[in-house]
UniProtKB/Swiss-Prot annotation:
Protein's recorded name: Bifunctional protein GlmU
Residues reported in the UniProt entry to bind acetyl-CoA: 359-360, 378, 396, 413
Family: In the N-terminal section; belongs to the N-acetylglucosamine-1-phosphate uridyltransferase family. In the C-terminal section; belongs to the transferase hexapeptide repeat family.
Annotated organism of origin: Campylobacter jejuni subsp. jejuni serotype O:6 (strain 81116 / NCTC 11828)
Catalytic activity: alpha-D-glucosamine 1-phosphate + acetyl-CoA = N-acetyl-alpha-D-glucosamine 1-phosphate + CoA + H(+); N-acetyl-alpha-D-glucosamine 1-phosphate + UTP + H(+) = UDP-N-acetyl-alpha-D-glucosamine + diphosphate
HAMAP family assigned: GlmU
């Protein structure tokens, strides 16, 4: 049975205390709404998002990454509440999966399990450790009797710890029939989607409660909950990679992006941060190193190294306090304290301490190309654009602003000067 998916993302998110819309708050460097959309499009090609607060800003980000998303706008003034969000929604398929835009931890497998039940109305519920302000779910004889919003719950109902996760699967025809019947006769004067359970019950529809994991289905409302969710996501990411054979030393201190890939035997030390679409292949990343959108193969990086975007390392050693950006290094040693930006360096080359590729002239970036088996002495500056042929020696302290031919020794230093007894003359000793 095909499914249409609707994501509710129109709330103000006032508890987040931010100028940025709640669903654009980032979790592991990716907006919450993007985490949800990735899973939604894996399940259906008919995905809609309901927006209101800062609609244009949220819509722009959604369509940049998921251009096939249908965008709807909720009239919060006249139709507030979760049921009000569904006005104007026209599903293309036989049933609808309704998700919340602030639930980025939900796994695709859990949604598939929810969809596997053929009841006309499925409701995701969980046993809450602390029910707080969640809506309470009353279940009798394996069927949902009703959902009571916390604001409207009596003392007895507040004691119930079975809570509404806010995720529904409903037959499209049933939704179309029941939605117009929902009113706003409640304490908040809102149109609650939870009322659809009561209406379905009145028509003797079987409502199936599907129990899910509380942590996975947590809604994120403030910065504290955002931090809890990010920690939870990081634990899952690192657990997965450790099960694939990656060694993490003090994994709780490392950050691994959702799109990072490890291949072969890899080892990651403490306080490492690997971001973006980085690929680490048979490599060791040592303490306190940062890698952004780069490929590291058969290499060791760090400690305290920084690979900025678009670096490609193969069979290379990058030591402490070395920064690379847009650099291709093949069988290279750069042991310490260097900046290698916008460059290509070939096999057998050694980069001495304090080497800099001066790649920016204030207007444009320029490239440095260094060939094979080049020895670069300490404190060398390459003024790009410049090309160093194979088997060259660059003397320490040189500033290289011209191309250097194969096999040459390049020296560029100011003539030294020594003034005898100058100290004694200056201080009259």
């Amino acid at each position: 049975m095909k499914t249409s998916i609707l994501i509710l993302a129109a709330g103000l998110g006032t508890r987040m205390k931010s100028q940025k819309p709640k669903v654009l708050q980032e979790l592991c460097q990716k907006s919450m709404i993007l985490h949800i959309l990735k899973k939604a499009f894996a399940l259906s090609d008919d995905v809609s998002v309901v927006l209101s607060h800062q609609k244009e800003r949220v819509e722009k980000e959604i369509l940049e990454y998921f251009p096939k998303t249908q965008i709807l706008e909720q009239d919060l003034q006249n139709y507030p509440g979760t049921a009000g969000a569904l006005r104007g929604f026209e599903p293309k398929n036989e049933r609808v999966l309704i998700l919340c835009g602030d639930m980025p931890l939900v796994e695709q497998t859990s949604l598939e399990a929810l969809l596997s039940n053929n009841a006309k109305l499925n409701l995701a519920v969980f046993k809450a450790r602390d029910p707080k302000s969640y809506g309470r779910v009353v279940i009798k004889n394996d069927s949902v009797e009703k959902i009571v919003e916390f604001k409207d719950a009596n003392t007895q109902e507040k004691e119930i710890n079975t809570c509404n996760a806010g995720v529904y699967v409903i037959d499209s025809r049933l939704l179309k029939e029941l939605l117009p019947l929902i009113d706003n006769n409640n304490a908040a004067k809102e149109y609650y989607l939870t009322d659809i359970v009561k209406l379905a019950k009145e028509k003797d529809v079987m409502i199936k409660a599907v129990f899910v994991d509380e942590d996975e289905f947590m809604g994120i409302n403030d910065k504290f909950e955002l931090s809890i969710a990010e920690n939870f996501m990081q634990e899952k990411i690192k657990k997965y990679w450790m099960q694939q054979g990656v060694i993490f030393h003090l994994p709780q201190s490392t950050f691994i992006g959702t799109d990072v890939e490890f291949m072969g035997e890899c080892e990651v030390y403490e306080n490492v941060r690997i971001e973006g679409k980085s690929k680490i292949i048979n490599s060791i990343i040592k303490s306190s190193s940062v890698i952004e959108n780069s490929i590291v193969e058969n290499s060791d990086v760090g400690p305290l190294a920084h690979l900025r975007p678009n670096c490609e390392l193969k069979n290379t050693h990058i030591g402490n306090f070395v920064e690379c950006k847009n650099a291709k290094l093949n069988t290279v040693k750069a042991g310490h304290l260097s900046y290698l930006g916008d460059c290509e360096i070939d096999s057998g080359t050694n980069i001495g301490c304090g080497t800099i590729t001066c790649n920016y002239d204030g207007v444009k970036k320029h490239k440095t190309i260094i060939g094979k088996n080049v020895f670069v002495g300490s404190d060398t500056q390459f003024i790009a654009p410049v090309k160093i042929e194979d088997e060259v020696i660059i003397a320490a302290g040189s500033t290289v602003s011209v191309n250097v031919e194969k096999g040459a020794l390049f020296i560029n230093r100011a003539e030294h000067k020594m003034i005898k007894d100058y100290y004694y003359k200056k201080f009259q000793k």
